Amino acid sequence: MAQKVKWLATDDPAIMFEDSPVGRMKKELWDASDEEIDKILLDYGIPSLSELGKAGSYIQTTPRSKQIEKRRKNDIVFVPIGCTENHGKHANSGLDTFMVTQILEGVRRYTAKIGDECSLAFPPLLYGGHPYHHIGMPGTVILPEEVVKETLIYTMLGLWDDGYRKIIFINNHGHCWMLEAAIHEFCKRYQLPGIFRTVEWHRSVREFFTPTDTNGNDFDTPFIHADEAETAVGMLLFNDMLDMSAAEEAWPTSYLFEGQFDTSIDCYRRPSSWSLGEGH
């Protein structure tokens, strides 16, 4: 008989965590004070300037002799996934790329501090895939789906050839179905041993992007593209790339009955994720 799943309640009846290592970690963060959160961020060196051009931070900025030694100790490589996309007049179009790289740079700094440094690869997609309703959006550059998939497949193949057996995409953009398809096609095509996965980091911490009166956040809406929550993360990581004087208050309009499609992080548990349909 399967073991019954246990849940960890919070001070908000709508928020609970699974009684698992991941759920217990999230519950600990949920209950942490602002001072404790600041200490955790300090452990990861967040905020810090972008390290895309810093020696020793990425595979591509590290002497090969040193990178080989690093990989022999830890063959996990994180691959940041971003894009070039309109995020409103107040934000930079490279927001997704800078957000995910600077988060992962914090992970690398922390793992180096504890003596088990992971590796980071340069973002393979500075321009990404997009849904149909993004066509014609100024500031957004759209690549064909097959280009996205094949770019990711051959990125994985090159990293595998270099000895990395645990390749993890960390996605900061909405083209998740393309990443999933790339991983499955890579495994079918080459049938190589390893662990290959993609993580939607926003969904991974969806509870913290859900408005609540009990946990001290001031969000009016759950996380969605270019909103107050995403902007707040940008202000933490790269404040000088944002111009809040140009920010505009705006609300989406639904053309279907309410309750059909969910938001970016599926926080409402609705029947369909946002990407499971198109039309006009």
Language-model-derived ranges and their functions:
Residues M1-K166, N172-H280:
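Extended, histidine- and acidic-residue-enriched regions that form the cofactor-binding/catalytic faces
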